From Swiss-Prot:
It catalyses: Hydrolysis of Ala-|-Gly bond in repressor LexA. Transmembrane segments: none annotated. One of its GO terms (biological process) is negative regulation of DNA-templated transcription. HAMAP family: LexA. This is LexA repressor 1. The record marks A87, G88 as: Cleavage. CDD domains: S24_LexA-like (cd06529). InterPro entries: LexA, LexA-like, LexA/Signal_pep-like_sf, LexA_DNA-bd_dom, LexA_repressor, Peptidase_S24_LexA, Peptidase_S24_S26A/B/C, WH-like_DNA-bd_sf. It comes from the Bacteria. The lineage of its organism: Bacteria, Pseudomonadati, Pseudomonadota, Gammaproteobacteria, Lysobacterales. Homodimer. Represses a number of genes involved in the response to DNA damage (SOS response), including recA and lexA. In the presence of single-stranded DNA, RecA interacts with LexA causing an autocatalytic cleavage which disrupts the DNA-binding part of LexA, leading to derepression of the SOS regulon and eventually DNA repair.
């Protein structure tokens, strides 16, 4: 499986877990589970897995995918996409269940609880680009220097945390953006810590 892309490995793990549960998902169900725009994208991954000998396809059957092995219970994560997070000027809270994606656990350094879609370019020097989906682990605390998702006066942003004796600053990773200095009377909370990202497309 070393030669598989992260997305293709996640599709294989999904099929293995479904097989363990006695299920054989259709292409439409695979596309829905991974947020693919069409059945064709699911077909591409399934066909590649079959050509690699990792699954078997039974001709002329809607649910004709056979999987020889099974995945461990922690190989896949079902993560909700809960809206957008600003990598730039903070944006108003846009938290609500958008969709759910199945992702390979190995994509993330920490185990995330949910995903947010990045809007803006303030974190590009950390490799976080507009449109990326970032994994977030719920936490009300973080270490100095960690990338956090923070709420400032009702708005949400992703930045590096810098705490000193007299101030909290949220640091961008793009010289075109200024740090956010959190006022003493601001409604400030750390919502979670950054776990990693996936780039769609």
């Amino acid at each position: 499986m070393d030669s598989l892309s992260p997305k293709r490995a996640a599709v294989l793990a999904f099929l293995q877990q479904q097989a363990q549960a006695g299920l054989a998902p259709s292409l439409a169900e695979i596309a829905q589970a991974f947020g693919f725009a069409s059945r064709n994208a699911a077909q591409k991954h399934v066909q590649a897995l079959a050509e690699a000998g990792l699954i078997e396809l039974v001709p002329n059957r809607k649910r004709g995918i056979r999987v020889p092995g099974g995945a461990g219970p922690d190989a896949l994560l079902a993560l909700p996409v809960l809206g957008r997070v600003a990598a730039g000027v903070p944006i108003g809270a846009d938290i609500g269940l958008d969709r759910q994606l199945w992702l390979d656990r190995s994509l993330f350094a920490l185990r995330p609880d949910y995903l947010l879609q990045v809007q803006g370019d303030s974190m590009i020097d950390d490799g976080i680009l507009e449109g990326d989906l970032v994994g977030v682990q719920r936490s009300s605390d973080a270490r100095n220097g960690q990338i956090v998702v923070a709420r400032v006066d009702g708005e949400i942003t992703i930045k590096r945390l810098e705490r000193s004796a007299d101030a909290i600053r949220l640091l961008p990773r793009n010289p075109a953006h200024a740090p956010i200095v959190v006022a003493a009377d601001a409604d400030f909370a750390i919502e979670g810590v950054y776990c990693g990202l996936i780039r769609q497309g």
